[in-house]
Amino acid sequence: MELIERFLRPEEHPADFQSLAGILYSSEIWIVPTHNPEGLSVVHGWIDEQENWVQDVSYRKNKTDANQNGIFDYDPIGYGNDLDGVDLNRNYPLNWMFGDQYLETDEGCSSNPSYVSNYDYYRGEAPFSENEISIISKLMLDYDFILSIAYHSSRSGCVAERVIYPWNWPGAKLAPDYQVIQPLGQEIAELTPKEVGNGTYHFAASGSMRGNAHDWSYSQAGSIQYLIEVGTSNMQPDDVDLIENTIERNLPGAFHLMKRAAGINYPTGPDKYQIKGIVSDASNGMPIEGVEVEIAQMSGGVLAPRLTNKFGRYHRLLYYDSFDLKFSKHGYYDSYY
């Protein structure tokens, strides 16, 4: 919400005005305040039908009636043990089969072995079974976002203050666009100071394969997505000053990503290497939708074809090098550059 405020009133932030103006003039920005309104309502609390205050500040999932008994079954004490709900960051189709099944227990993590959150990572009964994910995925596919950020808060501290991006899977399987993805992830992390002031956020390629949003968004929607775990295990804090400070420390990284998408780097900023254009029919000059634009050095079988939109436009981020491009569509001769 602070990002919306900054763009609505850039004159109130003179230090960022030039960057804000450049981003607005050069790109289209969509901000989704929450992907999980049901889970957020549980965290914020509500008054039930018996006039009781109900709240679970550690709740993670949505409110899907997983055990189908018509009641919202959750445990407000501690982490996990909530019988209902689906983890929306495990409900995407890519590698969904490796996610947690219903009532699967948790083993914690090496950095916090005492943290156990049983049932919290349930993948759902099927990929895209949850309305929230169906809606978000449609948005991603409809609008061809080139970059995106998904902000999370780390209850466990296991992955606190970290920028995570696609991917470095077992067997040294790197994302085809890794030479674009990794440097930007590192730059975002290095622009984000930690809460206690001793250094900046960590950065790492995702090694997990279990229906995550950032892997699906990149592979299927063509949007390189960075998962940013803000704050430490003290989230969700009641301290308003801490919340505002956490937001403020994360803004430079967000602006840096937007400038990368927009192709601007003033007064300082990211690489500008990218390619974009419009594919048209040589016989009539009309734009052609659905042309596959393949970059030989950045292609792979796990990626969905990168297609021109209804205006014939394509847009890809690059790194400093030479590239081989192929344009293809049924009914036309292939073109190579």
Where are these regions (language model features)?
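Active-site-adjacent structural elements in enzyme catalytic domains
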Residues: M1-Y74, L83, I136
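Solvent-exposed strand-loop boundary residues in beta-sheet-rich modules
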Residues: S283, Q297-S299, G331-Y333
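A short, solvent-exposed loop/turn motif at the edges and junctions
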Residues: S322-Y337
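Structural motif
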Residues: P270-K272, G277-G290
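Short, acidic Ser/Thr/Gly-rich low-complexity loop/linker segments typical of extracellular
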Residues: M286-Y319
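Extracellular Ig-like/FN3 beta-sandwich strand-entry sites
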Residues: K272, Y320-S322
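Metallocarboxypeptidase
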Residues: S27, W53, Y59-R60, N67, ...
